[in-house]
Amino acid sequence: MKKNTLSAILMTLFLFISCNNSGKDGNTSANSADESVKGPNLTEISKKITDSNAVLLAVKEVEALLSSIDELAKAIGKKIKNDGSLGDEANHNESLLAGAYTISTLITQKLSKLNGSEGLKEKIAAAKKCSEEFSTKLKDNHAQLGIQGVTDENAKKAILKANAAGKDKGVEELEKLSGSLESLSKAAKEMLANSVKELTSPVVAESPKKP
């Protein structure tokens, strides 16, 4: 959701809350009438909107970090030539893998700091678990990925999603992480949309209480 749209929603919330609070300071008859009208729970809706938007922003940051690993994968077996193009340089990929591992730990750190409403906590935890599993897989394959002269074959199995020759050194976990982030982003968008819908829903009058 764009920043301007979110600002408009939050301003609307502020106006709603201000109007509700001003009514409570009026006369008794006005307050009695207000109590017969059931409106949205503004405090709860405000929290859902704030939480879901924070999650969306964080997911975008993490997705950008994840994309940087995809870019690193394009450089497997490559070197910079003097004309600015990339030439072949086989089996020297240890720095690429170290970079991917550093990024994966940063992703885990960002997800660890993320809090969300009840409907998002489970998906946040799932994404964090996937990130940890990817980092662990790279670390556990230190004998092949943490040595001087990491082969193109092993590097591709670690971080190249399109590798058809194998994905057993990290790619499987990387794909799961990507999927979990998509699921988290979708859930946050749905919560935000539902909260806005709830905010703009018509006020319903309660049935008068029997004497």
From Swiss-Prot:
It is a lipid-anchor. SUPFAM superfamilies: Outer surface protein C (OspC) (SSF63515). Its main location: membrane. Disulfide bonds: none annotated. The keyword Transcription regulation does not apply. The keyword Signal applies. InterPro entries: Lipoprotein_OspC (IPR001800), OspC-like_sf (IPR036437). It holds the Pfam family Lipoprotein_6. Major immunodominant protein in mammalian hosts. Required for initial stages of mammalian infection. Inhibits macrophage-mediated phagocytosis of the bacteria. Binds human plasminogen; this probably confers an extracellular protease activity on the bacteria that allows it to traverse tissue. Interaction with tick I.ricinus salivary protein Salp15 protects the bacteria from antibody-mediated killing in vitro and in vivo. Homodimer. Interacts with tick I.ricinus salivary protein Iric-1, Iric-2 and Iric-3. Binds human (host) plasminogen. This is Outer surface protein C. It comes from Borreliella burgdorferi (Lyme disease spirochete).
